[in-house]
């Protein structure tokens, strides 16, 4: 039985004061980690404050990105060593916004994923198609390529322990959301691709999130699907009330 995982992706939002207040309010209220993994993936400048505020609780902290080197002349970048030292648990890699706005490739995401594992971080690897790709009948080829290339060279054990977030780009921050059946079919396809590459055991163990305008009023329908193990949530994770409602729905 795969444990559900709900991760908030705050993107470039909130202030430090708001972020710490969120953590202080939520950390004692989240369900036990034996039932569901709960995390918020925050801007890097908040991470030290948040890991300190949530230490010893069931609310885990994630980063939204990292570089694929431990150190060096990479101005503005953050290394996995730095994240691990701060007590970060998860790191989102390959989000569609990183792919679109910063030109991140599957190969770069793959390199980051391997480096995250080297340093004891849990990667949340994002894959997803645009509306144009879906309507053009390219969904399967795009998702197969992204999934295969982003996970290339990982061990079976690593695949079992990572998280894949399927995020249809056309449903992110648009208010549109895939139907629960569409989301299920898409997440099952991701699992099938992983099975073909890494075997059934890995595919049955890996947790797959759906991300795309998930809210408290629709999360139950998504979570009822057999191949959806959680959600990567944007806007609905910015307020304590809605974030806790997401967790209560599990």
Swiss-Prot record:
It is an enzyme of class 5 (isomerase). GO terms for cellular component: cytosol. Its EC number is 5.3.1.1. It is found in: Cytoplasm. Keywords: Cytoplasm, Gluconeogenesis, Glycolysis, Isomerase. Transmembrane segments: none annotated. It holds the Pfam family TIM. Substrate binds at residues 9-11, 173, 213, 234-235. GO terms for molecular function: triose-phosphate isomerase activity. Its main location: cytoplasm. The active site is at residues 95, 167. Pathway: Carbohydrate biosynthesis; gluconeogenesis; Carbohydrate degradation; glycolysis; D-glyceraldehyde 3-phosphate from glycerone phosphate: step 1/1. It catalyses: D-glyceraldehyde 3-phosphate = dihydroxyacetone phosphate. It comes from the Bacteria. One of its GO terms (biological process) is glycolytic process. Belongs to the triosephosphate isomerase family. Involved in the gluconeogenesis. Catalyzes stereospecifically the conversion of dihydroxyacetone phosphate (DHAP) to D-glyceraldehyde-3-phosphate (G3P). Homodimer. This is Triosephosphate isomerase. The lineage of its organism: Bacteria, Bacillati, Bacillota, Bacilli, Bacillales.
